[in-house]
């Protein structure tokens, strides 16, 4: 059983998945920092010096200045500023993944076009498209050259 697990764990797909998860986690941290430390402060500055992470609605009757004070008092709050940060975070990650997948698909399509086998050739006599394996043109009935042998036009 240990041998089977070792074979499974060392397969290319599992290793690729592991690398993807690690890189995805690191990328998520970078995007979260970008959102929390750069984007939302800039948006907040444009909207009147508002820090999104501090925006909340207090559902208890007691006033609190910060979310931390409300949490310490175990008060019920709706932390919509933190939710907005999470939404912005999600949009950036989703857009980044969209761009990466779009590029991968573009490269894959280009590679498929380059690798597509040639299935037709041009008849040298009537210039029509014919199958590569044809020995006689179905349009002008000319005999065609085959590997190493030149056949005359009838």
Swiss-Prot record:
Segments traversing the membrane: 14-34, 38-58, 81-101
Q: Which residues form the signal peptide?
A: none
InterPro entries, per database record: Mechanosensitive_channel_CS, MS_channel, MSC/AndL, MscL_channel
Coiled-coil intervals, chain numbering: none
One GO CC term of this entry? plasma membrane
Query: How the protein sits in the membrane?
Result: Multi-pass membrane protein
Q: Does the keyword Ion transport apply?
A: yes
Q: Quaternary structure per UniProt?
A: Homopentamer.
- Function in brief: Channel that opens in response to stretch forces in the membrane lipid bilayer. May participate in the regulation of osmotic pressure changes within the cell.
- In Swiss-Prot or TrEMBL terms, this protein is called Large-conductance mechanosensitive channel
Q: Which organism is it from?
A: Brevibacillus brevis (strain 47 / JCM 6285 / NBRC 100599)
- Report the gene name: mscL
